[in-house]
């Protein structure tokens, strides 16, 4: 089975307290958003303590056009992706020349040539590397990319697959959008960059713990296209997400996980480690109520959200990094995220501490 060789995340220069962001958002929205005082509690309800941003707060007080915002996305995405990759390569104790495949995940900016090409060129990675850029999966992208990386390594036991997830959510902030969705988004989303390396069976994996991939599942829920996504405007990306998301999760997630695990003669009670994309407090509550697992089974997920906010696709890799570096129970692990489509992504793992 393919194995996780290393996972790494980065911190940005601007780690800002949620209360400071709250007061800054109040100042920005107050002149044109009558409900601002009533809605400020959204910042507290998230239970987020701090968030990472690629820019100082003052940057977001000025209107930036799409051309400027996207140019900054390309520049900073490349810079921070390379930092995460270099940390991951060092942790995996491999040479960059050994990487055979690269999967690049993002939904918060555009680039052609794609960012993976820019990374390969800047780092002088193998010029024959297999490239898979993926755009548009949003919060589900991290799990989808992780599954695809493992599937590549399963198909080619000599593969050393690099997965990179870069989300600069703050650069999509529209200064003159005084909608409820934009206000709620400003209370929740943050910037995150993470990378992991998956090695095939024929390669020697030097990881301190064993996390192996068993299988994955994707599901798209019919007639839910408008639940989450972007509206593309002349000014940039306008965030769209429905208040029905927790209800959709609550209605579907138990049956989806149960059906997935049954294929491998497993039940939810057999899972020892839950590596979930947090989404937000209401999403976590929906998971807890639907799955009815004893104990604080989403502890790592909750702590990542509290410390970082929702970093879209990269968030679940932050959770994976925390589990990988700290502690977990020997046994099965389950990685889950939901995203635009509306869709779910799942991966089943076998986990053992060395």
How would you label these PLM feature ranges?
Residues 1-75, 175-251, 255, 338, ...:
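Condensing-enzyme catalytic core mediating Claisen C-C bond formation in acyl metabolism
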Residues 6-8, 105, 135, 160-167, ...:
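Short beta-strand segments
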Residues 16, 113-117, 144-147, 172-178, ...:
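Short acidic, glycine/serine/threonine-rich loops at helix termini
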Residues 46-125, 268-284:
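Conserved beta-ketoacyl condensing-enzyme motif
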Residues 84-99, 205-206, 255-272, 291, ...:
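Phosphate/pyrophosphate-binding loops at sites that engage ATP/ADP/AMP, CoA/4′-phosphopantetheine
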Residues 108, 126-128, 133-154, 250, ...:
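Claisen-condensing/thiolase-fold acyl-transfer catalytic domains that form or cleave C-C bonds
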Residues 111-125, 164-175, 225-230, 284-298:
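Acidic-glycine-rich active-site phosphate/pyrophosphate-binding loop
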Residues 156-162, 166-188:
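Flexible, glycine-rich active-site loops centered on histidine and acidic residues
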